[in-house]
């Protein structure tokens, strides 16, 4: 299932697609502390065939970035191609791209959230949030969300903010 994380160890290879965002390397450093075999590549500097040829690829991380998912280079195509084979974690723009790939629409949020903290209610039974309380605080830097009214049947909402907006999907 794309909702589960792989076990740790040096054989696990994670590819992070960088959507030209300054936060990418913060995420890279954190993931790298758990899974040392992580590679970052810009969204316009790799092909699907090159991704397919990576040895021991266990997961994809789609980084934050500016704009809408259609401006995220190979990100949406990578989600379409590998999303049913390996776990894909989308952060901000990556999260929105997952929503679009599975049939949802990305729309402006009710309010801009640039550098603001919010309480997020999560499904802590999902492996992504294992070990966390059912409410967490998260820093937010976005102005777009996955639309609730067009939310894809193939996905589940596993996190919402205090206004009910979708913050995490699986």
State each model region's role:
Residues 2-12:
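Short, Lys/Arg-enriched N-terminal segments with co-localized hydrophobic residues
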Residues 13, 37, 58, 87-89, ...:
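Structural signature of beta-strand start/N-cap positions in the alpha/beta core
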Residues 14-31, 43:
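N-terminal beta1-alpha1 ligand-phosphate binding loop
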Residues 23, 67-68, 147:
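Glycine-rich nucleotide phosphate-binding loop and flanking beta-alpha elements
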Residues 28, 72-76, 151:
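Conserved strand-to-helix beginnings and helix N-cap segments that scaffold or border functional pockets
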Residues 37-45:
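A short beta-strand-loop structural module common to alpha/beta enzyme folds
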Residues 54-131:
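Cysteine-nucleophile active-site neighborhood
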Residues 126-170:
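Catalytic beta-strand/loop cores that center a nucleophilic Ser/Cys/Thr
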């Amino acid at each position: 299932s794309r909702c589960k994380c792989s076990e740790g160890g040096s054989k696990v290879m994670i590819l992070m697609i960088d959507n030209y965002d300054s936060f990418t390397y913060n995420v890279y450093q954190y993931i790298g502390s758990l899974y040392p075999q992580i590679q970052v590549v810009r969204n316009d500097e790799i092909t699907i065939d090159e991704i397919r040829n990576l040895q021991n690829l266990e997961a994809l991380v789609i980084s934050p970035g500016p704009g809408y998912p259609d401006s995220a280079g190979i990100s949406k195509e990578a989600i379409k191609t590998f999303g049913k084979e390996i776990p894909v974690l989308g952060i901000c723009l990556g999260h929105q791209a997952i929503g679009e790939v599975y049939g949802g629409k990305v729309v402006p949020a009710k309010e801009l959230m640039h550098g603001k903290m919010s309480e997020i209610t999560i499904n802590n039974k999902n492996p992504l949030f294992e070990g966390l309380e059912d409410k967490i605080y998260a820093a937010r830097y976005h102005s777009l969300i996955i639309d609730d009214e067009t939310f894809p049947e193939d996905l589940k909402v596993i996190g919402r903010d205090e206004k009910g907006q979708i913050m995490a999907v699986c």
